Structures are given as C-alpha cells and as structure tokens.
C-alpha cells in the first residue's frame, strides 16, 4: 500500500500567516509570564535595576562612553525620611493614597494647562511613573502610554501603596546617572536619605519632572519656587497623611 503524500496547503501565504501568529502569541505569552513573575518577585525583593537605567547605560555604550557609571543604592522605605516620602506625594501625586493608579482630575487639569501654552505639566501618578521607570522607556509615545496603563493596574493590584512608593523613591532619577533617593542624598547632601530635612526633601522632589534640566546643586529661580510650594503643600498634608498608605 503506497504512502499518502502530503499535499501542500492551497494558500501558502495563509499558512505562513498562521505560523507567524502562533509565534507571536507564544512570544507575547512568554513576555506576559516574565512580566507577572517579576512583579510578584519585586513585591518582596529589592529591584536590582530599572528599564530606564538600562536604557541610559545602553545609550552611553552606543556613544562610546564606557566610563559612565550609574549611581544607585536601594534602601527600604523605613530608611527614607518621612519628609522625603511626603515631599514626592505633595509634589507628584496628592491623591496617591486614594486612587487606583490614575488621577483623572489631574490628567484633565494637565491637558487644560498645556493647551494654554504654559510650561508643560504632566498628569502621571506615582504609580504610573513607577510603571514607566521600572518596565518601559522614556519619551512621548502613544504606544508607551498604551502599555503603561495595564502595567500600572497590575502594580496597583499586586503591590501595596507603600511598596509602590518605596520602589518609586528607589528608582526615580534625581540627576544625570543618579537614581534613587539614597544615591541622591549622598551625592548632594552627604547624608543618608533617612536624615533628609523638609527643605532638602522638597528640593529633591522639585527636580523630579526633569532632573536633567533642573539642578539640585544649582537650583534655578523656578526650582526654588517649586521647592517652596512643595514645602507649603507638605505642611497642609501633614506627616499623618502617610498613615493612609496601606
């Protein structure tokens, strides 16, 4: 009895497309598993580096700048002064304790502010900034924003507010190659982050929107004005505000 010969697919292009889709689904599933696994892992262990740190390092390598060093030192939230914790909430996200990752009022306010042609202001929450810094790339992109939203929701679901704040403070950029509040505190003030005063914490928080242009060691009039505003907001919130974080 003769063996049956395999017949070729009548539509080879369709067959290639099906194979491509299967590979695409598998790749997506692999990335999803790796992402969720890392979120669960980083709920308990210090973050060794962020996607933005990696992006910066790769950029330096492409430029041929092999001597550039990323300054980064992880510290638990208990070793970061309450002044610093309150400063970033007062500066970046005053509804952090109560929202679920997104502050729609702040987003709408930022859009209206930017449409008036004033200094560009963002509406991203601390949760969104943590998602972006930890897993995504910087720059204006609708694709990044589209990925940022579900990433933020996953962090809000699997992490506590305290953990989100802890990771944010440890991976935020405070100057060229200076990541995390401990590295920033040691670099600018020669002291650990747990000893930061209200004024020092407010100054660090003041440069967060653009730490490459805004300088901690040479604050412009605008940065000083932001620092004073943040200190006033810290006084209005009060350190008891931190007790609202779960």
Curated annotation (Swiss-Prot):
InterPro entries reported in the protein's UniProt record: Glyco_trans_51, Lysozyme-like_dom_sf, PBP_transglycosylase, Pep_trsgly
Gene Ontology annotations for the cellular component aspect, listed alphabetically: peptidoglycan-based cell wall; plasma membrane
Topology versus the membrane: Single-pass membrane protein
Known catalytic reactions: [GlcNAc-(1->4)-Mur2Ac(oyl-L-Ala-gamma-D-Glu-L-Lys-D-Ala-D-Ala)](n)-di-trans,octa-cis-undecaprenyl diphosphate + beta-D-GlcNAc-(1->4)-Mur2Ac(oyl-L-Ala-gamma-D-Glu-L-Lys-D-Ala-D-Ala)-di-trans,octa-cis-undecaprenyl diphosphate = [GlcNAc-(1->4)-Mur2Ac(oyl-L-Ala-gamma-D-Glu-L-Lys-D-Ala-D-Ala)](n+1)-di-trans,octa-cis-undecaprenyl diphosphate + di-trans,octa-cis-undecaprenyl diphosphate + H(+)
Transmembrane region(s): 28-48
GO biological process terms, semicolon-separated: cell wall organization; peptidoglycan biosynthetic process; regulation of cell shape
Chief localisation class: membrane
Disulfide bridge map: none
EC number(s) given by UniProt: 2.4.99.28
Pathway terms, separated by semicolons: Cell wall biogenesis; peptidoglycan biosynthesis
Keywords: Cell inner membrane, Cell membrane, Cell shape, Cell wall biogenesis/degradation, Glycosyltransferase, Membrane, Peptidoglycan synthesis, Transferase, Transmembrane, Transmembrane helix
Subcellular location: Cell inner membrane
Pfam families to which the protein is assigned, alphabetical: Transgly
GO molecular-function terms, A-Z: pentosyltransferase activity; peptidoglycan glycosyltransferase activity
Coiled coil: none
PANTHER family membership: BIOSYNTHETIC PEPTIDOGLYCAN TRANSGLYCOSYLASE (PTHR30400:SF0), MONOFUNCTIONAL BIOSYNTHETIC PEPTIDOGLYCAN TRANSGLYCOSYLASE (PTHR30400)
Family membership noted in the UniProt record: Belongs to the glycosyltransferase 51 family.
Function: Peptidoglycan polymerase that catalyzes glycan chain elongation from lipid-linked precursors.
Protein name, UniProt field: Biosynthetic peptidoglycan transglycosylase
Organism (species): Pasteurella multocida (strain Pm70)
Upper taxonomic lineage: Bacteria, Pseudomonadati, Pseudomonadota, Gammaproteobacteria, Pasteurellales
